Amino acid sequence: MRLWFCLSFLIILCVEHFPGTLAVERNVPESEEKTEQFLRDLFEISRLQRRPAGFTPFRGKFHSQSLRGLSETKRIYNAIWPCKHCNKCKPGLLCKK
């Protein structure tokens, strides 16, 4: 009986120390901890990579055209309406204030 107990104890001890199914099944808390750490790291990465307001990831021909269109619209607006600050400046000129 003692021999059986010693052998079973040694077998369980060996299985625990070497990678195997029993060791994996008994390592549930460690794997949960790794999962939680992974989720915390993922949250931190996504928090650091947040984009500022108004940022567009779209680049290329159409993006530069839309920027060009904005400047043309601003020029047309300044040519038609007087200065916003004093309403006395001539259209198209920069305000001195």
UniProtKB/Swiss-Prot annotation:
Function as written in the Swiss-Prot or TrEMBL entry: [Ala3,Thr6]bradykinin: produces in vitro relaxation of rat arterial smooth muscle and constriction of intestinal smooth muscle. Possesses insulin-releasing activity. May target bradykinin receptors (BDKRB).
One function term, GO molecular function aspect: toxin activity
Originating species: Bombina variegata (Yellow-bellied toad)
Tissues expressing the protein: Expressed by the skin glands.
UniProt subcellular location: Secreted
A GO biological process held by the record: defense response
Chief localization: secreted
Signal sequence extent: 1-23
Family per similarity comment: Belongs to the bradykinin-related peptide family.
The name this protein goes by in its record: Kininogen-1
Keyword annotations: Amphibian defense peptide, Cleavage on pair of basic residues, G-protein coupled receptor impairing toxin, Repeat, Secreted, Signal, Toxin, Vasoactive, Vasodilator
